[in-house]
Amino acid sequence: AAALVASGAYKTVAVTAGGCTAKLGMNGKDHVKKGLPILEDMLGGFSVIVTQDDGVSPEINLDILGRHSVGTGSAPQAVIGSLVTDPLERNGLKVTDIDKFSPEMQNPDITKPAGAGDVPLANYKMIAALAVKKGDLQKADLAKFTVEHGFTGWAPTQGHIPSGVPCIGHVRNAIMDGKMKRVMVIGKGSLFLGRMTNLFDGVSFVIQANSGAEKAA
């Protein structure tokens, strides 16, 4: 969407997605099996409007894009490397230059009883571990990293719904208020693709404070 706007092909693009009843049923089945009430009883959805630069609103930096190619493999370290550390390194940035990361933002109150653990926390631990390996972070700061650069998951766990984008409204407000400068949104993982091919898919991008001088979506 940002590329379409930045190219001038379109002035405004709406990115819209809805939840999935099949995933809702899968989670509910796991909860009932453990004698719990069905904790996820709603369909998620979101819509994001991407439009031309107004010189004020946060922008998407199209120079910092992470991609997960087939050759990357499915190992967690390889996935996070291709989506997080690689694009940052290409642009002369460290992991610690990003104020917040928004990976798979599933609500742990829902995923833990279903046996999937705390998904956002697992992602933050991997990002922090890679940052230590790259020399961007001290090992003693690993625990602090997840608090300072992460969010607690709050989104419904339906496929693409929690994958990065739930933070966008909150992040926009925080950047406008001067509380944040750069945030990386990470969309990754596909349950069904993974089960069929043992592969992942994914993309990441950075939302940042308006640069003013540059034309950006």
Q: What spans do the regions from the language model cover?
A:
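Condensing-enzyme catalytic core mediating Claisen C-C bond formation in acyl metabolism
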Residues: 30-103, 109-112, 128-137, 142-151, ...
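C-terminal transmembrane helix-loop-helix hairpin of multi-pass membrane proteins
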Residues: 114-117, 121, 128, 153-162
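Active-site-adjacent elements of ketosynthase-type condensing enzymes
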Residues: 21-33, 165-169
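Active-site-proximal alpha-helical scaffold in enzymes
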Residues: 1-11, 50, 158-178
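Flexible loop/turn segments at secondary-structure boundaries
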Residues: 22-23, 108-111, 191-195
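Short beta-strand segments
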Residues: 13-19, 183-188
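Residues that mark the start of a beta-strand
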Residues: 10-12, 97, 181-182
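Hydrophobic alpha/beta core scaffold segments
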Residues: 166-172, 178-186, 190-196
